[in-house]
Amino acid sequence: MSRRLVWLGAMLTLVGWSATEATAQASQPIYLQYDGFVKNKDGTYTLSFGYFNLNHVDVRVQPGPDNAFLPAPGDRNQPILFLKGRHRFACSIVVPGDFGGQLQWIVRVAGKTFSTTAKILDPLYELELNSEKRATSGLDLAKAPKGVCVNRAPSIQVINPQADVNAGADTLAATSFATRLDQEVSLNGSVEDDGLPRESSLAISWKQLSGPGTVTFSEPSRPVTRARFSVAGVYELELSATDTEHTNAVKIKVTVNAPDEKK
């Protein structure tokens, strides 16, 4: 049985970014990482790349000698805005089944050169199921252009505020929960995006879809916000995100009980 690369790590939350935000020159490394590959049912491969920006600011590196893939073409629609922190699955590339296995991403910042492994199709890098889903999420293999980073819809999740963090990742996603009318509820959304299209901005929005009263969000344009409900009842809320080309959204149901009612 061949071994596969297994990733363990904490969940990352991305607060909405804008391409117009100020960026600075890198003084710390931006480590590139090869997340691994998926062998698709149609015989093609999906290759996934990410990065870890150790700077305390977002860093912009334009395509060219300092941000390129080898072999050519160097510009494969890879990210040019490197958000601070670690970001897996930032670039997913679909390649034909006869792909030779030679592809490296190279970035030069802070006077140093950083690159991904050359062993693209090493069996150790074949992704496990959960990572496979993230690497291929939003990909239409029949329409995806080959050999370039494909823009995918933002990935969205809302964390259940009443979840047991020790019960496993599958229990963290919220579909419904209850609160009391006299309480302000925390809505902990998570939005991840690949930074494509280039020079675009990611727009995030909370809104009320239904309910007997009105919902007031403290910060409706951020994934993490707080909400107050005007009257008791059942409400449906939606967190959406768009990168100007693709939009994704998740819905949750919140049951608001009167203070003297049990949850």
Model-identified regions with their sequence ranges:
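C-terminal edge beta-strand
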Residues: 248-258
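Short, solvent-exposed loop/linker segments at the N-terminal edge
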Residues: 39-41, 173-185
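Proline/serine/threonine-rich low-complexity linkers at boundaries of modular beta-sandwich domains
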Residues: 25-28, 145-166
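Low-complexity "stalk/linker" and mucin-like segments enriched in Ser/Thr/Pro/Ala/Gly
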Residues: 79, 173-174, 196-199, 207-223
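Residue-level recognition of secondary-structure-to-loop junctions
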Residues: 39, 97, 227-231, 244
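Short tyrosine-centred short linear motifs in exposed loops/low-complexity segments
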Residues: 43, 97-103, 231-235
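Extracellular acidic, Ser/Thr/Pro-rich low-complexity tracts
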Residues: 51-55, 190-197, 210, 243
